[in-house]
């Protein structure tokens, strides 16, 4: 039995996102290199009332990088009618890649891409695995799973979406433990490999069906198999000694950064 997933983005929403990105380029005098969907729509289990979490990477004109004082390296747009839009400047994004930031790595693996500069994004996707740190990724995902489990799943009635916000990072950590490298962003791809128990798979699919048909705030009774699986998995975690820290070449990031900033394709 395969796991349910969906990535609902209508043509109207896609057009709104592209219009917003073009407006950001005009207002901030930047070039958007890459824009994707993060959050539950990217993970494949959005509720009908889920926001659209649009994340992007952008680059300024060369002169912007010549100032003595550091300048703001994020662009944030107030949430408006379901659209939550925010982006990171390219140098910031590459610094985070150097530190194996899981959030950036997930953006680059998103199943929903609104815009991309093919050459630049292809290079970023090629560089990302060379900087992936199993230790940092595992710590990030286990911390997220434990925090959500302690904070939201201790009562008899629980906020159902939080099970998925625990399961996904927990399975991502197990994916890393299995030596599979960077975890996939889509939850169904992750669970299909990491969950073998048939009754547990069935219960997770029931949870996915409820999540994808209900509001973000839906509460309900505990899912006993999922709950027991999470408790046992969190209790059993121990850090293996041979985890790879990530060993990419910073000079490759510098070369890519220089070439991208100096590229003659910035809109006038």
Which role fits each region the language model picked out?
Residues 122-250:
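Conserved nucleotidyltransferase catalytic core and NTase-mimicking acidic/glycine-rich helix/loop elements
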Residues 67-144:
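A basic- and aromatic-enriched beta-loop-alpha substructure that forms the phosphate/nucleotide-
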């Amino acid at each position: 039995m395969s796991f349910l997933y969906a990535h609902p983005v209508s043509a109207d929403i896609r057009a709104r996102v592209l219009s917003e990105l073009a407006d950001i380029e005009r207002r901030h005098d930047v070039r958007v290199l890459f824009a994707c969907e993060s959050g539950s729509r990217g993970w494949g289990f959005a509720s009908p009332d889920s926001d659209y979490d649009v994340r992007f990477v952008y680059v300024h004109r060369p002169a912007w990088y010549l100032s003595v004082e550091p300048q703001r390296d994020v662009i944030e747009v107030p949430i408006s009618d379901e659209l939550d839009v925010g982006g990171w400047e390219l140098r910031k994004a590459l610094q985070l890649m150097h530190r194996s930031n899981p959030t950036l790595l997930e953006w680059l693996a998103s199943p929903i891409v609104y815009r991309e500069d093919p050459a630049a994004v292809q290079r970023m996707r090629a560089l990302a695995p060379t900087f992936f740190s199993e230790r940092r990724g595992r710590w990030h995902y286990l911390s997220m799973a434990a925090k959500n489990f302690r904070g939201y799943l201790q009562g008899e009635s629980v906020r159902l979406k939080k099970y998925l916000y625990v399961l996904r990072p927990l399975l991502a950590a197990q994916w890393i433990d299995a030596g599979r490298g960077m975890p996939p962003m889509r939850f169904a791809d992750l669970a299909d490999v990491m969950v073998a128990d048939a009754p547990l798979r069935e219960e997770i699919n029931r949870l996915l069906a409820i999540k994808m048909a209900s509001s973000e705030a839906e509460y309900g009774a505990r899912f006993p198999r999922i709950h027991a699986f999470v408790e046992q998995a969190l209790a059993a975690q121990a850090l293996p000694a041979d985890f790879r820290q990530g060993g990419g070449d910073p000079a490759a990031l510098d070369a890519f950064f220089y070439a991208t900033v100096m590229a003659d394709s910035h809109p006038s």
